[in-house]
Amino acid sequence: MFRARIRGIYATALTKLALDWGFKVVQPTPQIAERFGLRPDPSPPDVTVKDHESKTGVVAIGDCPAVDHLLERLREYADPVVAKASAGLHDVFVGRVVGEGLVEGPGGLMEVPGRYVLQPGAASVFTVVKPPVGPLRGVAVPEIVVDGKLLELNTTGRVAYSRHIGEEERLRLRILAETRLKAYASIGLRFKSSAKYAGEEELAREAEELYRELLRLSQGGPPGALLRRGRCLAVVLFDKRAKFKLDEARAAVVPTVRGHHALRGQGLGRCLDLLDHVGADVYERAAAFLARGRVAIYHVKPWGEVVKMRGEVVKALEDVLVVKRTLKPGGVLDGIGARIEPGTYALTCVPRSGGYVVHSYYSASGVYLGTYVNANTEPEWGRRVVYIDLLVDKAYGPDGVERVLDEEELQRYAHMLPERLRRPEAPGGKICTPEGLTSAPPRSSSA
């Protein structure tokens, strides 16, 4: 039985599902413990689940078998977008330095922070501190980091503490680091969040085990060798359909309205609790109400990268939002070729339904420059307009000639998408104007 620690805005739904799937939920929050009748269990988890920065998904990190089992069950239930890192957090490997600030590691080339002086061509022991996901390069350091359930032993020479350890427990652990664990602390020691539940003997025992492992790893190996597997990491993104499925799971435990998780991602607190309590089915109206004035558009890549675009809603129709965005001068418009001059702006049309968003571009004087259509999951309206990019785009200038972009990228990362999202299509012939979507190029715009 795998042990899972679950945090964040999806905690109730995912705890319900995890229990149904045979996981043991450990270190539950008081609210979760009360809802599920769970007894306190300070056991360290095999997998931790927490919010993704976009609030449109979660990050799962832990022992690889536990992470893989969780991903398998999530795919079966919610059919989400899943991007698993190609190397583990704290994988320890022998890497060869190539170029400036790069090392060959598991999952491809990895960046090395500039504070380390590297000799090109030299081979050394490295540890992955930021796993590579999709096209995002990982980060590795020429240090050894050995993960345990309670502690992390490393070669940094520093003592550190998880931010989830309070001052009282931190004082106890600091005294321990200066006494019984002093020899390990002089090498480099970090107390993980589960350490606050552990006794002195348990911590000392794990420190000794990690020290022996660190000595073994310090012997190195041939270039390219993976000396120790770290923890698996995966980004799991929920589109609107998947969030509705999680609403259903939560509703089996506590009163939950349709759209609960989408609205919670908008930052709603007590007012959402009230909607849950009275059973008000008002998701569409609530989302439209929130999508007023200044909004942030969260363009979320399948691997979890978030591109944030801020703008002002200039038109709110029943079926489409029109958002005006001022662009930073410099460079050219991708797929269109027009230069971004001072005053150039975009009108972004976000349909309530449909798998696309339309960005049309205008000069400072309102002359139409071209359009970029993004294929994505059905957008979620609100003070945050959220969608997951499906990697295929279409661009056309004033001449109307269409260019399909990024098809190779879709082929490369289609495995991250559920089958239902693997054949996206960016519609052509659509242009965003101050009045909404049209198919005719405007002569000028005065938004």
Swiss-Prot record:
GO biological process: rRNA processing
The protein's enzyme class: hydrolase
Pfam families, A to Z: DUF402
Keyword Nuclease applies: yes
The EC number(s) this enzyme carries: 3.1.26.-
InterPro entries xref list: DUF402, FomD-like_sf, Ntdp-like, RNA-bd_FAU-1
Alphabetized UniProt keyword annotations: Endonuclease, Hydrolase, Nuclease, RNA-binding, rRNA processing
Region annotation (Disordered) ranges: 424-447
UniProt superkingdom: Archaea
Any one GO molecular-function label of the UniProt entry: mRNA 3'-UTR AU-rich region binding
Keyword RNA-binding: yes
Homology family: Belongs to the FAU-1 family.
PANTHER family according to UniProt: PTHR39159, UPF0374 PROTEIN YGAC
Function: Probable RNase involved in rRNA stability through maturation and/or degradation of precursor rRNAs. Binds to RNA in loop regions with AU-rich sequences.
Protein's name according to its UniProt entry: Probable ribonuclease FAU-1
Source organism (scientific name): Pyrobaculum neutrophilum (strain DSM 2338 / JCM 9278 / NBRC 100436 / V24Sta)
